Regions:
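Short, conserved secondary-structure transition motifs
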Residues: 141-144, 243-254, 372-377
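Basic, alpha-helical interaction scaffolds
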Residues: 263-337
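Mobile genetic element proteins and their domesticated derivatives, centered on retroelements
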Residues: 16, 32, 44, 48, ...
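Catalytic palm subdomain of template-directed nucleic-acid polymerases
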Residues: 106-124, 202-231, 248-250, 283-285
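Extended C-terminal regions of large enzymes
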Residues: 319-325, 348-349, 360-509
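Short, conserved micro-motifs composed of acidic
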Residues: 237-270
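Conserved pre-catalytic core of RNA-dependent polymerases
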Residues: 1-178, 182
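Family-specific functional microsites
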Residues: 306, 468-601
Length: 601
């Protein structure tokens, strides 16, 4: 088939399922078309895609500015590059940096196929059997629309790359890459980074485009060049979503800082969501962190719905779902912003832990984390930062992130605080200054394991010192290691987990606790007439109000000759016995129910 360059007509057909996104269901723009195509054609397209990709990379048909759908490239590469360019100017006194974030209207659907084939033939040197195959593939594209069980007749599609085809992203990248060539041939200039003679003119990730400049006039020239490019190649810019951000250290946008596309003024905004990370005009990440936290909370809500629908989901499974679905949201882009502990980020996991335990504000955050055997998110954030640093070290010198890194190193040496400064500080803080000096780690996988363990060990020391409340002293005696106790996994009922957790944390609603030299409230038990202090020993072993359920649930050894020692022993033994935990949980629930009933009389 490849030898003949002929593409079967049946493979060129697709069935489109319109999927409603949001908004008015009568508006066509609020639907995303999902195209179903022949499976065999997908396999064939994958083979063609691999050959074309190898050819494009070998002949540098795709510029460094395009990071979309390329091996070894990611959204984080572009996010880091943009952040580095902004830091270059914001670390100067009065520095300003300008970025136009471009949104194309239905970019993939608007590609002019004749011009695409011309571009492939004339600009990239793709010819022969490959060119014949691509031309045949796009010579007779047809689609139909299916809604419910009804389907339309097939109709011709004359524009756009094929939806659902694995080859389409690469073809679009080749198509859009011509923009950089036109910018280079114009009077615009790139942002200087270390050793690149052209500099950075723009950043692309598939159809996500950002034009960058260090002055107002040059950015307008780039916009004019973009306008000519769109007119020439048939693309349309969505002005309602195309914005300019003026990066600066405070102050207002100047009157002269305004730009026009096609005679229409481009809106200047204080922040922009670029590739999932919100860039603030002063490079403050607080809004980005809040946005990620909000998305993560929605994902947690989905887990909770699943938890209440399927009551018997093991706790270990719930945490695996959290690590798979929620944590990646919280950590997205942390390679550039994850140098500190953000309360909004940590609270998502803390509240999830408390939800599993069935507790609320009555249990300290650090205790809830300890009961669930979890570590703070910032540990993963630090690891991702260092992992990305190692990735940059392994890049070749043509890559934008590597050039930006070398630029930031030079700035750091001159006293300008930036991303590199923070990397160095983390490595020195945790005893790996020699790694910074060597500018590499050798076996990166081994280093990451050692580095993460160092962070965990450091946190364990801090965790112990943070339990400074008198009520927490006893808790430390039977929760020595930061491992999840058996009851959390073994007790299916959240009510039972709550009872044991409150018991272990000394947070049951008893009248008084005097065991640690601090009296809380009226110490006398008002459930019985013994005129005794209502501490845990009285509650568990002595109070006659609970005699019947005590005989039922508490082993006789503990309450025959009650003592503080036996209470502590009971809690320690609960770490090893699920059956004992279950009995004690039932006792606590029943006893607290009796207590509330008598107090309400």
């Amino acid at each position: 088939m490849f030898e003949s360059g002929i593409y079967p007509e049946s493979w060129a057909k697709a069935i489109i399922f319109p999927l409603h996104k949001k908004g008015n269901p009568r508006c066509v723009d609020n639907y995303r078309g999902i195209s179903l195509i022949n499976i065999t054609s997908k396999l064939y397209s994958s083979v063609i895609n691999k050959r074309l990709y190898v050819f494009s990379e070998r002949n540098e048909c795709i510029p460094e500015a395009q990071a979309g759908f390329r091996k070894g490239y990611s959204t984080v590469d572009n996010i880091f590059t943009l952040q580095s360019l902004v830091e270059k100017y914001l670390t100067r006194k009065g520095g300003r940096f300008f970025t136009l974030f471009v949104d194309f209207s239905k970019a993939y659907d608007c590609v002019n196929r004749r011009k695409l084939l011309y571009l492939l033939l004339k600009k990239t040197g793709i010819h022969g059997k490959m060119f014949s195959t691509l031309r045949s593939m796009y010579s007779n594209v047809k689609s139909s629309v299916r809604i419910d069980s009804k389907i339309t007749e097939y109709f011709d599609c004359f524009s756009g790359v094929k939806q659902g085809c694995v080859l389409s992203p690469l073809l679009f990248s080749l198509f859009l890459s011509e923009l950089q060539s036109e910018l280079i041939n114009s009077t615009t200039k790139g942002i200087d980074i270390f050793s690149d003679p052209i500099g950075v003119l723009l950043l692309m990730y598939a159809d996500d485009l950002a034009l960058v400049s260090d002055n107002v006039i040059d950015l307008q020239r780039k916009i004019d060049c973009l306008e000519k490019y769109c007119n020439k190649w048939g693309l349309t810019v969505n002005m309602s979503k195309t914005k300019v951000v003026v990066f600066k250290n405070g102050g207002f946008v100047k009157e002269s800082e305004k730009w026009y596309f096609g005679g229409e003024k481009v809106q200047v905004v204080a922040d922009y969501n670029y590739l999932g990370v919100i860039f603030g005009s002063s490079l403050n990440w607080s809004k980005c962190v809040k946005n990620l936290s909000a998305k993560a909370r929605k994902a947690v809500a989905g887990i909770k719905r699943l938890q209440f629908t399927l009551v018997s989901i093991p706790v270990n499974t719930l945490f695996k779902i959290f690590d798979t679905k929620v944590k990646p949201i919280l950590l997205y882009g942390s390679e550039v912003w994850g140098f500190q502990k953000y309360d909004e980020i940590e609270q998502v996991q803390i509240k999830f832990c408390k939800s599993i335990l069935g507790v609320g504000r009555d249990v300290k955050n650090i205790v809830a984390m300890g009961e669930c055997g979890r570590f703070p998110i910032f540990i993963d954030s630090y690891c991702r930062v260092i992992k990305f640093w190692c990735k940059i070290m392994e890049m070749n010198d043509k890559r934008y992130p590597k050039q930006c890194y070398n630029m930031l190193v030079a700035h750091d040496k001159s006293g300008r605080i930036n991303w590199v400064t923070k990397i160095r500080n983390i490595l020195y803080k945790y005893g790996y200054g020699f790694v910074w000096e060597a500018q590499g780690v050798g076996d990166s996988n081994t280093f990451f394991k050692i580095f993460k363990q160092r962070l965990i060990d450091n946190y364990k020391q801090d965790w112990d010192s943070m339990l400074d409340n008198p009520l927490d002293v006893e808790y430390r005696n039977y929760h020595i290691t930061l491992e999840r106790p058996k009851y959390v996994d073994d007790l299916i009922s959240r009510c039972h987990r709550r009872s044991i957790c409150l018991l272990r944390c000394n947070r049951l609603e008893l009248n008084a606790l005097v065991r640690f030299g601090e009296q809380l409230g009226n110490p006398i038990c008002n459930i019985c007439n013994m005129n005794a202090i209502e501490d845990y020993c009285h509650f568990f072993f002595v109070c006659p109000a609970y005699l019947k359920i005590r005989r039922q649930y508490v082993p006789i050894y503990y309450h025959r000759f009650p003592s503080t020692f036996k209470y502590t022993l009971l809690l320690r033994n609960m770490n090893e016995s699920t059956a004992l935990c279950f009995k004690i949980a039932n006792y606590v629930n029943a006893a607290m129910s009796i207590r509330r009933s008598r107090l309400s009389m």
